[in-house]
């Protein structure tokens, strides 16, 4: 996979993984369940692997999904930290 996977799809995947539910993740993100599902499916298609194991009752991580989550969660945390630092710097007079 190239590095051009949409960040929104990665964020969608992380939310589904953390909530273990498309419905709860969609509610947390303020998007429809179908839009969230399409985003994750597109990410899986782009990567060529299944990230999530879906059943009628729950959503779990595949082995690939668990490894991917560990890697991207740290990256997303760094992005959040960068925004927080910029917000702090902006509120301090120069």
Walk through the language-model features, giving the residues of each.
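Residues within the DNA-recognition helix of helix-turn-helix
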Residues: 32-42
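A short LG(V/I)-centered, amphipathic sequence patch enriched
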Residues: 44-61
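Short helix-boundary/capping micro-motifs
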Residues: 15-30
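Hydrophobic two-helix hairpin corresponding to the core of helix-turn-helix DNA-binding domains
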Residues: 10-13, 25, 62
């Amino acid at each position: 996979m190239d590095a051009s996977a949409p960040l929104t799809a990665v964020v969608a995947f992380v939310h589904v993984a953390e909530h273990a539910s498309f419905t709860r993740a969609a509610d947390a993100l303020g998007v429809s369940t179908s839009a969230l599902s399409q985003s994750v499916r597109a990410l899986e298609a782009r990567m060529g692997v299944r990230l999530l194991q879906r059943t009628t009752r729950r959503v779990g991580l595949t082995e690939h999904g668990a490894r991917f989550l560990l890697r991207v969660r740290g990256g997303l945390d760094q992005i959040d930290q960068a925004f927080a630092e910029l917000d702090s710097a902006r509120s301090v007079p120069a």
